[in-house]
Amino acid sequence: MIESTTSHQDFQQRSMTGYALEHPSYRVRGALFRHQDDGRLLSGTSSNFFHVRSSSKITGCGGDLEVIHALELERSQHTGLPVRVTNVVVFGSNDVVRLIQPIEGTEDVIVNGDYHVSIVQSVELFESSTVSKSRILKLPGKIVAVNAEKHSNTELLLVFLLETGLYHYSFCAQTSDHFQCIQAFRCNRPITSGLLWRDSGLLHVAYYDGFVRVGVVHEQYDDMLLVKRVAVNRNNLSVLLDVVFEEIGRIQKFEDTEKQRREDMLTTSKCLSDKLVSEEEVVEGDTATEDFAKLKVDFKNQSIRCERVSQRLISLRKLITIIKSYMDMNDQIEQMIALLVDQLEELEKLEQLCDEVQKTGNQNLIGKSWIAVEEKRMVVDELIAKVNSDQIKKHSAEWGNKIDQIIDQLNGCSESAKDMRMIISQNIFEHRGDKKDVYTHFVLDSQSRDITLYCLSGLTTLAIYPRKGKRHTSKTTNIRKSQIFRVASISLDASFATCLTAACAMKSAEGVYVADQNAVFPIYFYSEKRYLDAGNQLQIPAFDSISSILIEPHQMILGSVTGGLLHLSFDFASNYEHFVVASSMLAHPISSGAVNCIKLLATGESLLALHCTDAEVVVSEKDQDRWHRVTHHTGGAHSIAVTPFSVDERGSFAVVASDTFVRLKALQYAEESLIGLHDLGESRAEDENGHPIEVLNVSLDPSMQYRQLPCKLRYAVGFSDKAIRTYVALLTGQHDFTVTEKFIAQIEPLFSVQNMICFHGRPMGCYVSCAKTLQIWNDLDRHQQKKLKSERMQLLKLSSSVTSMERTEGFLLVGFADDRLSIYEEKGNGAVDLVGTIENWHTGLNDRSVLGLRTRISKTSCGTRLFIHSLTAHHIVIHTVLVTSSKIEQHDFIVAHEHSMSQPIGFEFVSYKYFEFLVYGRGISNEKLSIEDRKRMDCFRDFEFN
């Protein structure tokens, strides 16, 4: 569609912040963030807690950020045109964005995935860019919560609540290694959800590890500073030694102070215990009990602190010994280098003297001078060999390993795991719920009258808030101002039990919004009455699986699994009704839920995609660079097989596999560009007890084409009862879409039907992989006889498990779990011959199993050229093979293209474009080879004129 904009308007749009002529990718949006300054929207993937500002938006698709300008959102909302975005590549396919939050005191944002975190500068949000890998940190566990604090113009303090504990990192922009772990507490119970926030420098934590716990973390900034100084000066031994001696002096002073403090605490404890024992009645205003409880906390904190200090002292003394030994080694190296410099100077003088003797013509002197020069060169070469010896390189590597071990001991990474409660200096709240009641989200509402912490599960909502105390005036939140807290809770009916995907605090009233995959529920909080009330489900139009929420006064934006953005406007008259007065799609989702399978059909004028999820089967059409839904059928599926699109008949047949049955569908493309998807019927199989058998996969006879009805359709279905059944569907009548099943054969029970592909033939045959075997079967229907057994034409026993299969014109490709791929050639008699095997398929990658094979083939006079593609978690690996006379004549690895889809399921070729692919999973991503990679592929393309 062509927009009617003048060049002046186009220039103004291009100059907008966050504007680019790119279309949004259809990947999961799990984090929505409004930028403070200019109204941009940033989008990421699912998160547990959102910092929402009042003026701008950022969204994240997969491992990237999408920046959408506020005017672009308004334009899309009014015109229905696709949202144009600025794409910032952060994690790519390595991770998915889970949280976007600002860094206080800066215009930058911190972005984290499941295991990675990155600092994204504000200038990178103005145009499409890629975040430097030096600003991406991989953490030792799954990230639960993140907190970032500015310490100086070049330094940040980052705190990560991981599944395995609490970690502090320093980020310094001026060092080559930006990130450095400076303090770590490892816990022995996995933390599944949580939240971090600061108040006046104090770090607060709320988490769930079977218990809901809230407390204040005791941070030792002097210890963090020591680790940082050791890391910075790790290669400057003299300065490092001074740092160590200074720290030992500080520890000795600390020991003297703590000894006296412990004696005072013991004296106080004895007095309090005697007082508590002697008192028969509690005297009003007596604080002995509270003082004794506080003293117990002080004893615990001191014990933990003294234990860490003693371990630090042992590590520092060990470091002194290591430094001294390496200083001696460095002195020896410096002496050798000084000696080498002296010898080089002497060699230079001898060479000058030799040149002067050469001018005299005295052969005797010339000979002696050259002998002296050669002897000196031998001495120099020997010294150079010593300086460059492997021993010195080994010495340098050992120093790096030892200093890393010392740093891990100082920051706590090498310590044994402990109870998380031991690192909390003050326990604020603790709650144990039902074992089935797992708390997945924590939300801190700092905008309400009283600071309130919400702990959310699929069944229960807890609200923790102070009983007394004035509203804190600073921007930070202090939940410790009052030591007494009220707790309100609501347990929903079991029918409401759900798995929450997103949650956020309300703006117009006290409470929270919670969302599962399909709906949004308000939970209102009446703090004065200590009462929580679950409101009615929001009435929203049909939408994708919800993955994120951005709430603003009287409006809401929902993000979905396949890239959708839904805007809702509420009635201003009431803060509690949340009646939706308007809704509009800012970005259309490609489907409802994750894509299980996709098939592309080229119609001549456009490109169609037939894809399925757990909830529906969808037909989408590509208009330039934008995919839009055309029609859909309810009912989920996990596998699709289609006939090639018939340009003459304007249609295609599809076999769609659901859990326990197979549906036949006809896709018709009318002359007036109307696309229809018609249900023709279904087939299923039952066991001896009449229970339906689970369907694993389907495949069509490749000779099948779309024809006018009545016609026949041959297909095979793999079932979970270790059998493959083949069918002929008799499609009768022009408009009466019914299926008559003609049972032909049941293949003998197999060990396991893992991969199945039909091939040409009368009878039709199937390639079947079963663990470490490849079987080839033919159906005996030569004379249209019924219920005859199938015949196994060939059985190949393999050395490794089969992970994928692909059939192309005359060849069968088999991928294995041990990084190999074998090519077989079809012989036309129901058998295949091995052409060759390619070892080390994933060159330079960590992947082993060869998955998701797709092949392009071209036949020339010199042989058959195969371009073989396979999918890994992060790459599309491309090889080329030339087959001549049933042998591999040439094999070359071309490229490993890094795609942007996290946790992909599969991929398909885009018709007529050898450099373009559609990767699918939680959404879809259109991938294109770079110009350099295309040129590399063109080097192997055999051009011939026929």
Curated annotation (Swiss-Prot):
May have a role in tumor suppression. Residues 326-363 form a coiled coil. It comes from Caenorhabditis briggsae. Keywords: Coiled coil. This is Protein dct-6. The gene is dct-6.
